Amino acid sequence: MQSPTAQGTNDGVRPARTWPSVLGTLTDGRDLSVDEAKWAMDEIMSDNATSAQIAAFGVALKMKGETPEELRGLADSMLGHARKVPVDDDVVDIVGTGGDRSNTVNISTMASLVVAASGIRVVKHGNRAASSKSGGADVLEALGVKINLGPDEVARCVREVGIGFCFAPVFHPALRFAGAPRKEIGIPTVFNVLGPLTNPARPRAGLIGCAFPGLISVVAGVLAQRGNSALVVRGDDGLDELTTSTTSTVHIVADGAVTTRQLDPRDIGIARVSLDELRGGDAEVNAAVARRLFAGETGPVRDAVLLNAAAAIAAFRGLGGRTLEDALSDGLSTAAQSIDSGAAATLLARWAELTSGLATSK
């Protein structure tokens, strides 16, 4: 067990850091400091916390309501325990929290390939499905990409192809200590939103989808504190990405500040569709959808992928004084060219071939 340490506050000195003091702070409805949150996660990631303490922490934090400082402390701890990817931070991630239970096709995964094919390097961080039929890792496997690669292999993929995938269990092995308590309590907690904040490549830009309406501004706040350029989004139909069935809420993170607005896809020439037109299936079904998309199939799925790819491109480039709609319109043209030129299909084939070779040589 780590030795307890005292925490100074404006009102005096808090009790030494122990689980009773941290849990007592939360159950009293008071916020943790960045360092206190980091201490708690360090204990969890070091296997120094019991299942009861982990479960109590997740539930108490959820009931109080998480702050950007708390999420930042937890995420910083996770990154401190993670395996590092040796790439510079001039990359973008396109990722969602999951948990929207919509069972749509893998929009963010397809968008990641489109963005990478446009020449912007992508490091995607993801996992297998938790509440859906197909997660990002599942569909990439079905597309022929080997996902169990280590840091050096992922970095090589980024250098040679322009995209890499960090499979969460490989890069955050210590998170397994929280697995059983999370499963036992059976409700979403802060652990469900940490994935998009803990990409081991530490990208400077991102399109981050958040399925939980009460946490979207908190996630945006963490990214602002880090100085990232990002769009943090939630479809007003509940999707953890930009939707084409209705409007989306968009938190624009730039220069350490957050601005919030609504986006209607019709304002950039994308028709609204029924959410049913974006539904998918298991990994094999969704992989077939991706292959048809990259072969030139048009329709609602293409529109949704282009919209999210455009948003990631806008987050990477920055708005630069443009309106969100203007930045997205520029990104749409770039994304469409990635598909129509065959670049996205070619990139996928090259990536699958490279990862197969790397996996064989491990």
Swiss-Prot record:
Its cofactor is Mg(2+). InterPro entries: Anthranilate_Pribosyl_Tfrase, Glycosyl_Trfase_fam3, Glycosyl_Trfase_fam3_N_dom, Glycosyl_Trfase_fam3_N_dom_sf, Nuc_phospho_transferase. The keyword Membrane does not apply. One of its GO terms (cellular component) is cytosol. Gene3D superfamilies: Nucleoside phosphorylase/phosphoribosyltransferase catalytic domain, Transferase, Pyrimidine Nucleoside Phosphorylase, Chain C. It comes from Rhodococcus jostii (strain RHA1). Keywords: Amino-acid biosynthesis, Aromatic amino acid biosynthesis, Glycosyltransferase, Magnesium, Metal-binding, Transferase, Tryptophan biosynthesis. This is Anthranilate phosphoribosyltransferase.
